[in-house]
Amino acid sequence: KSFENLVSWHQTAIDQTENPLTIQVGGKEPTAEEVMFNGILGTAGADPTADEWIASLDLVKDYTDIYQLSCSHIHQHLKTDQDVLKVHKAAKEMCAELQEYTYYIEVPKYTTHYTQGTQPRNKQNIITWINSCLGSIGNSKYVAYFAGGIKYYNEFGLLSNSDVMGTIFGLGDTSASNYGPWKSFAGMNRGVIYDGQGPVSPNYGSDSRYNELNELAQMYANMIVIKDTPSSGKQTMLWHCFSSQVKQDSERFLSIVRLNLYLKKTLRPILNKYLEEPNIWGTWKNIYLEVKPILDNLVDENAMSEYTWMGDQDAGSYSELSVNNEADVRQGKYKVILKYKDIVPMQEITINIVIDAASKSVNISENE
């Protein structure tokens, strides 16, 4: 198919004619009768099964420094929704158990397997597919859905329909590296895809389609859309960055889930360093002094507005303990409570435009 695209591109974009092209290999035109192959023919591998996908998830457990996990292009390799959902369920259960990663699910851009047709999904098809997935795997703050597909120019200069997961990973990692994982990677500041050419699905980013886009958001669909920007015209971007949590608290925002993962991944090695040290308030004070600059920086970076570290770090005797108790401490156990006030991504801006009809005169002054 790529070779056919190359010929098509040469005819339409370069040659601008419909004249037939002559292709030669080794100075000769290839024919059906003359096929030459030099080398050793290998054994073609089979498409992985759902069980093989699930077994491969176990290998991820060796790595806890990542934030984003996905089964890339799984809907292209597995031809039935039943098999796809089976893998998604196993991945979701692993992420919920370990609480180390966020798992991203791509809503297939076509209504059928690509070998059976290439009809793009519309709003209702997207919602139906997510509902089917939720019915199989359930809701989770560690799972997020991305939909819409995306159009790119391929290496031959031809506009092609693509999956979005690679782009989503790029947005998430770039945002985390430059701004911190606690910042949303959607919207006009960190979610613009400058070489994207719009979604495969209908563009629900138009202002006239606000209700449809909002309906998709209510069903946890984070969409690829085209929107007008203040200074760069129309741009392709990711709009919304929600998890699939049912409870309407701050962890319905993927940025807050990622903040909690950041806290876990950052504080864990510091706390582990103090294992086997004397379990006494002097050690607790040292722990607090080591983590305090990290937490202060999170306040400065608008990850949280304030925090409270409650770990009896100021105690001087067992009688002054409030979070811990003497019995547990003397068994080598130490407990800390970290409370913070989160800062969530802005989702709605309301401006009231009022015409003042009370005044009957207008004064115009000119500054010289």
Question: Each predicted region: which residue ranges?
Answer:
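Short linear interaction motifs
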Residues: V35-V60
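Structured, hydrophobic secondary-structure cores that serve as assembly/anchoring elements
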Residues: H10, Q16-N19, V25-E33, A55-E368
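Extreme N-terminal leader/targeting regions
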Residues: K1-N5
